Amino acid sequence: MLKSQRVTTMKESLISFIREKIEEYNYRGAVVGVSGGVDSAVVLSLCVQALGKDRVFALILPERDSSKDSLKDAVDLCETLGVEYRKRSITPILRKIGAYRLFPPRFFLPNSIVKRYVLNRWNTLSKDPFLDDLRNTGPEEFLKGLAYYRIKHRIRMCLLYFEAEKRGYAVVGTTNRTEYLTGLYVKWGDEAVDIEPIMHLYKTQVFELAKEMNVPEKILKKPPSPDLIPGITDEMAFNMSYLELDRILMKLEKNEDLSDEDPKKVERVKKILEFSEKYRRDIPITFDRI
């Protein structure tokens, strides 16, 4: 946990960091992908305070499976901050390339039924979906699921850069330290950015910073989710809360005593780190020079 004074200092440091890097690399402003979640809310707010609202452009890129509540939260945040924004559905692009053929059509099915169906597939196609995701292993149907959700972030990345380069802006990312260490991001998707201002902050610390920055309560109370597959939350993938996960990650990083933690959860975090490190390190895989 960060003390109140440290949170304020961190906020000011990040505002200065964004402003300095934008100028150092000759960018004219910043583009941020806004999802309606806490990470993008914090980053958008930081960019506005660093650069002014006239030099920040927000892009909201929902698709068929996106939460309507999150979409509204994203729009409300942009309007509250007074930034220029564009809302563009990527459903037509995903449909055109055949992504939705990997998943049954929703038509008029209630969201609750879709979520139950997804959870059933999540639990039956793999004994440990998150680890299998990091290892790129599993039955064919599971691998199709990986392709299904990863393409969404990669399409978003292309559109973010399209909007940024038209303006001479930087793409500012929203990945936090917990996501980075555990591999909860899409390679060449949401990790492909120019500046990552919150990658040193664990998820629980991002929440503390969000409170300092007056991020709307509705966003703070929402269960963190990648909003890529209906019904799947971050904590469901990890099999533990962010509070537990961050506490274990911090202790491992500082080589502190773990005897008061659940041994099974500690072992799980270690496994996640083992595979996520390889995921990060092997970008791209190259031929070793002799």
Curated annotation (Swiss-Prot):
GO CC list: cytoplasm
Residue positions binding ATP: G33, V34, S35, G36, G37, V38, D39, S40, T174, K203, S225
List of residues binding Mg(2+): D39, E179
Record GO biological process: NAD biosynthetic process
One GO MF term: NAD+ synthase (glutamine-hydrolyzing) activity
InterPro entries per record: NAD/GMP_synthase, NAD_synthase, NH(3)-dep_NAD(+)_synth, Rossmann-like_a/b/a_fold
Role played: Catalyzes the ATP-dependent amidation of deamido-NAD to form NAD. Uses ammonia as a nitrogen source.
UniProt subunit comment: Homodimer.
Family the UniProt entry places it in: Belongs to the NAD synthetase family.
Protein name from the UniProt record: NH(3)-dependent NAD(+) synthetase
Gene: nadE
